[in-house]
Swiss-Prot record:
Family annotation (CDD domains): Terpene_cyclase_plant_C1
S-adenosyl-L-methionine as UniProt keyword: no
Gene Ontology CC annotation, any one: chloroplast
Protein name in UniProt: Ent-copalyl diphosphate synthase, chloroplastic
Length: 801
């Protein structure tokens, strides 16, 4: 599974780059261990700065790199106790957030609050039903006279919020000075609408804004302009859109139009009330529901608005509740940031909540909805499936028409994030799920076309780096996506609290976009990286003492072996698995390189078997290290002994005999089959699981499942290795070959076996090792050497700042 490195890649030197702090102990052949000393602080070393030269990054849909040099000019010594206190504090803050998830933490919309403030008391005349909403408006005008998001200026957002608030205050003859200030802002900034990206225009702006203008003209002091070319253009768009609204249909079946009823004329409220949501709202929109209450005096509308106004102390958001949206997106962010392991229990609760509400027609942003959208459905589908819940791919048939997929019924265009999440969901497919294959091809085509046209702008969110996020997904298929690589890039892409969502107005989701998540992710990443650099030092020492270089293993191959292990298993507490994986891979490559013909293979296998003493399978620990013709066999034995000894110290289990048997099985196949031997993946899987303290039941049904998984993974990984060798020989990329080969169907079967829960199932951690190994082989076969060099430099040696 190795590929040749670019000559531009300079390996870090063990002696010059990294050091072990005196409080760290490590065997040259074993895992890193930590020795505590009373009242003394442990430290970690991590590179602070490097000289790098990047050229042609992400060209022709794949990352390329010219890395002239990696060196360390300085080191940062991190106070471990202080770091631990910060990390614990952040984890506790986030746990508190996750335990408090309810209907959604969302910012207030001045526009919607204004509509609520306009409602007249249902039991009185000329009295506001919600005086606290008027209070909120009066208290939340910005210094420039506008209302809206205070941290991001959007002319569309500020204009519609400001006009709505001025109308509300004027309607009740309140705060004339605030109204005047608001109208000055309105007139001075109206022209800015012309220069803004239409993709970032609030939802339904072209219908809602003209309705407000018409209402404002009935209030004399407002003096709204009526001769502006911009306004004329908006009214034309309004008229065009209204002619396309199927009013007959909107009165009969639930559609997204229920979310934007405010200001619309000619509505049959008797029919529309039949489409009301269970909570009394019209598709969870306070402004739409407020308008409905004005027209109908409906008690359920009043009940919904009373609850929301009370919840938000007078103001109301642009949509509420958003419970499903929040639960799903929070889990996605935590997982991609690489910190989900701190919140396993809370994430399980989140997914159980979503699972209870999931329907065969899909979901939307809130529970008990008669309208579904592909964005929330795709995100929920993907996460539910990956967390072992039973969900059918047939759900996506509700979002497909005439060969195309849409976000909502009746929608004409595809939003970038909707297609992006559909693309991500479509990759988690089981055998025979044609609808997901179709969804994958369609969404990929849409996204690639938008990328080529430089149109990766979304109408639902303004985020830090959507083009790079989508580009990563397009260029790195899920089967090849190693966890640590994704996390390293996503930490740079995640905007945290700077990301803004687009509804009827701009809004923020404090529990989805949270600085605490990003801070913990950065701290944890650098902490993990620090340990990885120490382990890389250990691996290099082991490499020198084992003299593997003399048998043909290059340092480049050694680094790739460690990178594949670290990219897949990154957690500090899993050092045994990571080091065992890297050393096993290095030994496999060395043996295959040094022992080439069949006679030598048989001789090597015989020497190994002759050394095995089942009564004392730690014999290798006492073998002399003087150079002999059997040194490679001795290095193998010594490594097995050291790995088993470290595991015994940590978990109290003796795995030496089992490791010998695993190697014996592989050598037996390899001596007769040579390059045709399919057992490398099996050897890695068995050793990783032995080192992980995850023990496999001996029951016949369990063993049958394990054998099937082994056969499947062996076949996949062997074919990927063949593709990789072919790629290296021909000097070409084999990406298309992988995509069009039988590997895809076998990967689908493997995904189903790993992620679909069955009665009396084996431990998921054991099953997931099979998929983890398969992904590492897929990655090595899929990516070219420049891409791998770039990933190694970024993931292992570039500190997150």
């Amino acid at each position: 599974m190795f590929t040749h490195f670019s000559t531009h890649f300079h390996l870090p030197s063990s002696s010059s780059l990294f050091f072990l702090h005196p409080f760290y102990k490590s065997s040259s052949l074993g895992a890193v261990s930590f020795v505590a000393k009373d009242k003394e602080k442990r430290c970690r070393a991590i590179s602070k700065s490097r000289t790098q030269e990047y050229e042609g990054v992400f060209q022709t849909n794949v990352a390329t790199l010219k890395l002239s040099e990696i060196n360390v000019e300085d080191v940062i010594v991190i106070d471990d106790e202080e770091e631990q206190d910060i990390r614990v504090g952040l984890v506790n803050k986030i746990k508190s957030i996750l335990s408090s998830l309810e209907d959604g933490e969302i910012t207030i919309s001045a526009y919607d609050t204004a509509w609520v403030a306009l409602v007249e008391d249902v039991n009185a005349i000329s009295t506001p039903q919600f005086p606290s909403s008027l209070e909120w408006i009066a208290k939340n005008q910005l210094q420039d006279g506008s209302w809206g998001d205070s941290r991001l200026f959007s002319a569309h957002d500020r204009i519609i919020n400001t006009l709505a608030c001025v109308i509300a205050l004027r309607s009740w003859n309140m705060h004339s000075e605030k109204c005047d200030k608001g109208m000055i802002f309105f007139r001075e900034n109206l022209s800015k609408l012309e220069n803004e990206n239409e993709e970032h225009m609030p939802i339904g702006f072209e219908v809602a804004f003209p309705s407000l203008l018409e209402g404002a003209r009935g209030i004399k002091p407002l003096m709204c302009p009526n001769d502006s070319p911009i306004l004329k253009n908006i009214f034309e768009k309004r008229d065009e859109k209204l002619t396309r609204i199927p009013k007959e249909i909107m009165h009969k079946v639930p559609t997204t139009l229920l979310h934007s009823l405010e200001g619309m004329s000619g509505l049959d409220w008797k029919q529309l009330l039949k489409l009301q949501s269970q909570d009394g709202s019209f598709l969870f929109s306070p402004s739409s529901t407020a308008f409905a209450l004005m027209q109908t005096k409906d008690g359920n509308c009043l009940k919904y608005l009373n609850n929301v106004v009370k919840k938000f102390n007078g103001g109301v958001p642009n949509v509420y509740p958003v419970d499903l949206f929040e639960h799903i997106w929070v889990v996605d962010r935590l997982e991609r940031l690489g910190i989900s392991r701190f919140f396993r229990h809370e994430i399980k609760d989140c997914m159980n909540y979503v699972s209870k509400i999931w329907s065969e027609k899909g979901i939307c942003w809130a529970r008990n909805s008669n309208v579904q959208d592909i964005d929330d459905t795709a995100m929920a589908f993907r996460l539910l499936r990956l967390h072992g819940h039973q969900v059918s791919a047939h759900v996506f048939k509700h979002f497909e028409r005439n060969g195309e997929f849409f976000c909502f019924a009746g929608q004409c265009t595809q939003a970038v994030t909707g297609m992006y999440n559909l693309f991500r969901a479509s990759q988690v497919l089981f055998p025979g799920e044609k609808i997901l294959e179709h969804a994958k091809h369609f969404s990929a085509k849409v996204l690639k076309e938008k990328r080529e046209a430089n149109e990766l702008i979304d109408k639902w969110i303004i985020m830090k780096n959507l083009p790079e996020e989508v580009g990563y997904a397009l260029d790195m298929p899920w089967y090849a996506n190693l966890d640590r690589i994704e996390t390293r890039f996503y930490i740079d892409q995640y905007g945290a609290e700077s990301d803004v969502w687009i509804g009827k107005t701009l809004y923020r989701m404090a529990y989805v976009n949270n600085n605490n998540y990003l801070e913990l992710a950065k701290l944890d990443y650098n902490n993990c990286q620090a340990q990885h650099l120490i382990e890389w030092n250990v691996i290099q020492t082991w490499y020198l003492e084992s003299r593997l270089g003399e048998f043909g293993l290059s340092k480049r191959d050694l680094l790739l072996a460690y990178f594949l292990a670290t990219g897949s298993i990154f957690e500090p507490e899993r050092s045994h698995e990571r080091l065992a994986w890297a050393k096993t891979t290095a030994l496999l490559e060395t043996i295959k390189c040094y022992v080439r013909n069949e006679d030598l293979r048989k001789d090597f296998a015989k020497k190994f078997n002759d050394h095995i003493d089942v009564r004392d399978y730690s014999i290798a620990r006492r073998m002399k290290r003087n150079k002999t013709e059997h040194e490679l066999v001795e290095s193998l034995f010594a490594t097995i002994g050291e790995i088993s000894w470290d595991v015994r110290l940590s978990y109290g289990h003796e795995i030496g005999y089992d490791m010998h048997q695993c190697w014996k099985k592989w050598l037996s196949s390899w001596q007769s089959e040579g390059d045709k031997c399919e057992g490398e993946a099996e050897l890695l899987i068995q050793i990783i699981n032995l080192c992980s303290n995850h023990w496999i039941s001996e029951g016949p049904s369990m063993q049958s499942t394990i054998q099937h998984l082994l056969q499947l993974t062996n076949s996949i990984c062997h074919k990927l290795s063949c593709y990789q060798k072919d790629k290296e020989l021909k000097g070409i990329s084999c990406q298309e070959n992988i995509t069009n080969s039988e590997v895809e169907s076998k990967m689908q079967e493997l995904v189903q076996m790993v992620f679909q829960k069955c009665p009396n199932d084996i431990d998921f951690n054991v099953k997931n090792t099979f998929f983890t190994i398969a992904k590492s082989f897929y990655y090595a076969a899929f990516c070219d050497s420049r891409t791998i060099n770039f990933h190694i430099a970024k993931v292992l040696f570039e500190k997150v700042v």
